[in-house]
Design a protein with these regions (language model features):
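Alpha-helical tetratricopeptide repeat
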Residues: 1-128
């Protein structure tokens, strides 16, 4: 039980640091969670959070590597935010067709999301 509390506390601190734009501290905490939770059902969630930190830092290849790991997890329910993050990362890596595909999948899951719609327009402008 105490390991759950520890995991919960570490995640809470990581998210607090993320909100405060302290991405290095958030990455350190997420790295600890990922290492400790190698078999945790939450590992993919931690990888997604870490991918967002990498995205914010401009470390797009690292972000894509984490997103690819999440993609392999058949048990992780991928929400629109996964596809939005993947679409952004692929956009910044100039993989526009793949970016559009990810964003369209995200839009299917959240049809009224204006942020995803804006990103799709941005990608389509690059494809012209």
């Amino acid at each position: 039980m105490s390991s759950d509390i520890s995991e919960e506390s570490l995640l809470s601190t990581a998210l607090d640091n993320f909100i405060l734009d302290n991405y290095e501290a958030a990455l350190n905490q997420l790295n600890s969670l990922i290492t400790k939770g190698e078999t945790s059902p939450n590992k993919s969630e931690y990888l997604l959070y870490r991918a967002v930190c990498f995205l914010k830092q401009g470390k797009f290849e690292n972000a894509l590597k984490d997103l690819d790991e999440v993609e392999k997890d058949a048990n992780y329910k991928k929400e629109y935010n996964y596809y939005l993050t993947r679409g952004k990362v692929l956009y910044y890596l100039c993989k526009f067709e793949e970016s559009k595909k990810a964003l369209n999948t995200g839009l299917e899951l959240n049809k009224d999301n204006n942020l995803i719609k804006d990103w799709i327009k941005k990608v389509e402008n690059e494809l012209k």
